[in-house]
Amino acid sequence: MAAKKSSSPNRGFKVADQIQRDLTELIRDLKDPRIGMVTLQGVEVTPDYAHAKVFFSVLIGDGEASEEALNQAAGFLRNGLFKRLHIHTVPTLHFVYDRTTEKAADMNALIARAVASRSKDDDAA
């Protein structure tokens, strides 16, 4: 008996990309004041499309408050995705505040301090 042919390995990435694009538009229409200026960084979808982790950062506003508000609006957003996506299972959304940009800014500040300290040491020598 022949093995079951799996769907294209890129399909998961395509679905995740489409979810990200559609969610960007749907989130823009939310009226919750706790949601700041949100940027979606990426979406990870499970192989069975049952769950999707949506990673986001916040330019303006509180990240934790935005995460709470987005997770509360997840059902509404999932319903909006259901109307836009043409797949059998629309994943349950789980929003995760991505602190990568904050950590990168902190690292840049540390590097700048180290370089400034080193140049002072070189000038003193």
Swiss-Prot record:
UniProt-listed InterPro entries: KH_dom-like_a/b, RbfA, RbfA_dom_sf
The keyword Hydrolase is annotated on this UniProt entry: no
Subcellular location as annotated: Cytoplasm
Main localization category: cytoplasm
GO MF, one annotated term: ribosomal small subunit binding
GO cellular component term, pick one: cytosol
Alphabetical keyword list: Cytoplasm, Ribosome biogenesis
Entries under Pfam families matching the protein: RBFA
Biological process per Gene Ontology, one example term: maturation of SSU-rRNA
Family: Belongs to the RbfA family.
Self-association and partners: Monomer. Binds 30S ribosomal subunits, but not 50S ribosomal subunits or 70S ribosomes.
Classification via NCBIfam families: rbfA
Function statement: One of several proteins that assist in the late maturation steps of the functional core of the 30S ribosomal subunit. Associates with free 30S ribosomal subunits (but not with 30S subunits that are part of 70S ribosomes or polysomes). Required for efficient processing of 16S rRNA. May interact with the 5'-terminal helix region of 16S rRNA.
HAMAP family: RbfA
Protein name in UniProt: Ribosome-binding factor A
Organism of origin: Acidovorax sp. (strain JS42)
